[in-house]
Amino acid sequence: MKIRKFLTYGVLVGATAFFLGACGNSSQNSNSTSNSNSNATTQTANNGGKVVFIPKVTGNSFFESGNLGAQEMAKKEGFTVDYNGNPVASVANQVTIINNAVQTGAGSIAVSSVDPTGLDNALKQAQKAGLKVVTWDSDVSPDARSLMVSQGTPTQLGEMLVKMSVDALEKRGKDPKKDKIKYAWHYSSSTVQDQNSWQKVGEEYIKKHYPNWENVNESNYYSNQDAQQALNVGQSILSAHKDIDLIICNDSTALPGQLQAVQNAKLTKKDITVTGFSTPNSIKKYAKDDIIEEWGLWDVKVQGALAVYLANYLASGNQVKVGDKINVPGIGEVEVQNN
């Protein structure tokens, strides 16, 4: 069993950096943020400011870990983080929280969006009302926020998903280059920006390097970041494709649900390969029971801490532009790049 810890943070030995895109051109996100000059600065964010920190969904260990990092940063730096989400992942629920942030006088918002454009109008209204907007984990349109804190580029994460799959298949005795590998993607929805970008890159990588693989459902399987749906969808995949070799779950709710479905079917990692992204706490049971060989994660606590720090940094009157650098307490120097 192996965990690939992809992103911790750039100041740690051997780690790679988060990416942070500034408002501007579209496409891949980039490295971080800073003050309006090109030298690294350590300006302090405004003490007493309130950041509304919005996950895609509550009750999920990935987002709860992000909140831990956010709260630790806020306590250390003297501002407030209001972790406000809903157990049902939907545009309507997130819009309600955004509107409430405006009405209650928050200084900024840091949101992981459930939809790439569905929050745009609400966030633009928040900006007009004076709130600063940062996205993290999953983005919106560039003109609906100032900065995006991303865990990596689509290329990095999409290819990583396939490479973990190949590694686990080989450990089962499969030859990924020659065997006909039947596989499927199982994640949250067709509209979540981050997961779909990883899936697209991963699918292109498979077609280029493993043309012998067969996607049994090119429309993919979705479980809407709902734990029960993830289990149900996981069971339906196994029922519909009894000879499936690989299921890639690029979603922190889909992966444990799929693994539970595999375990319920009395299968192990010797029978089927399941991989993806999720936190150690949600996967350790299945690793111990030999249901999963390998999965990936990044340090979402650092990502959450960085998102709220930057949101409050902007709300404190600091300005950023592409090329700027800033020293974030406890994290290190980060740089704004075009997204």
Name what the model sees in each region:
Residues 94, 150-179, 230-231, 278-283, ...:
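Hydrophobic alpha-helical segments within soluble ligand-binding/sensing domains
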Residues 49-73, 77, 82-98, 112-116, ...:
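Extracytoplasmic "Venus flytrap"
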Residues 75-87, 182-185, 207-225:
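Short beta-strand elements in bilobed, periplasmic/extracellular small-molecule ligand-binding domains
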Residues 180-190, 194, 300-339:
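Hinge/cleft segment of the Venus flytrap/periplasmic-binding protein
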Residues 62-77, 157-164, 193-213, 229, ...:
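Short, solvent-exposed amphipathic alpha-helices that sit
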Residues 108-128, 202, 219-285:
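Hydrophobic alpha-helical
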Residues 20-39:
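Bacterial lipoprotein signal-peptidase II cleavage site
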Residues 122-156, 160, 172-182, 280-288, ...:
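Flexible loop/hinge segments that line or gate small-molecule binding clefts
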